[in-house]
Design a protein with these regions (language model features):
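A short glycine-rich beta-strand->turn/loop micro-motif centered on a GG-aromatic cluster
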Residues: 140-143, 161-176
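Short glycine/serine/threonine-rich phosphate/pyrophosphate-binding segments
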Residues: 146-153
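Active-site-proximal loop->helix
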Residues: 174-187
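A charged, well-structured terminal subsegment
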Residues: 190-206
Length: 206
C-alpha cells in the first residue's frame, strides 16, 4: 500500500464543489513577491499571469473580489513573531513600493483590499464579515505563497464553512517542492483543486 492508498482508504479528497455564490480572493500578489531578491522566485510570475485571466472572468460574472497585502506600520509597532521569523516582512509598509499590488492585478473600485499582519486573510481582519455581507458560500483562493499565506487562508476559509477552491495554476511559491506538497495536502483535506480554465468552465456550466 502506498501513501496515496492510505488517503483513499481514509476517505480524504472528497469533492465539495461550487456553491451558488463564489467570491475570489487574490492573496499577496504584491511587488515584493515578483522579485527573487525579496520574496519571489519559483512559479510566482506564471501564477500572476494566469490569475489575470481568472480576475477578468470574476469581474465579468460579478463575483465579489478581494485582494490582500501584508502591511506593517512604518515603525514595526504592529509586528509580532511572524515578522521576527521573516524580518524582511517589515519592509512591507503602507507606502513602500514593495507592498503594492502588481499592476496587472490592480484593484478596481468596489473591490476589497485586506491589509493584514499575519498569513491568513481572515486573521485580525474584517474579511469574513465582508464575505458574509455579500452572501458568499464559496471562496476561490489565488495568490502566493502556496505553502504560506494561501494555505493559511484556505484553512481558515474552511473553518468559516465556505466551500473552498484553489485554482492550481493561479497559486505560486518560491520553491516547487512546498508548492506541490501543499497543493496535495490542501486537496486532500481542505479544498477542491482545478486549473483556472477548468474553474471558469465549471462556473459557466452552472
Amino acid at each position: 500500500m502506498d501513501e496515496l492508498d492510505i488517503y483513499k482508504r481514509q476517505g480524504f479528497a472528497q469533492t465539495v464543489g461550487l456553491g451558488r455564490s463564489p467570491a475570489l480572493v487574490i492573496v499577496d500578489f504584491v511587488v515584493s513577491f515578483t522579485d527573487p531578491a525579496h520574496f519571489g522566485g519559483g512559479n510566482i510570475l506564471a501564477a500572476i499571469d494566469n490569475t489575470t485571466h481568472l480576475l477578468a472572468f470574476a469581474r465579468e460574472v460579478g463575483w465579489p473580489v478581494a485582494h490582500t497585502r501584508v502591511v506593517y506600520a512604518d515603525d514595526g509597532s504592529d509586528a509580532g513573531v511572524f515578522a521576527r521569523k521573516a524580518p524582511g516582512l517589515l519592509k512591507l509598509t503602507e507606502h513602500s513600493p514593495l507592498s503594492q499590488i502588481v499592476s496587472a492585478l490592480s484593484p478596481k473600485p468596489g473591490e476589497l483590499v485586506v491589509r493584514k499582519q499575519q498569513a491568513s486573510a481572515f486573521f485580525g481582519t474584517g474579511f469574513a464579515t465582508w464575505l458574509t455581507g455579500r452572501g458568499a458560500d464559496t471562496l476561490v483562493v489565488a495568490g502566493c505563497t502556496t505553502s504560506g499565506c494561501v494555505r493559511a487562508t484556505v484553512v481558515d476559509s474552511v473553518a468559516h464553512n465556505l466551500r473552498t477552491i484553489v485554482p492550481t495554476d493561479c497559486v505560486g511559491d518560491r520553491a516547487l517542492a512546498p508548492h506541490q506538497a501543499n497543493l496535495f495536502d490542501m486537496g486532500q483535506k481542505y479544498a477542491d483543486l482545478m486549473t483556472g480554465p477548468e474553474l471558469m468552465a465549471a462556473c459557466k456550466a452552472l
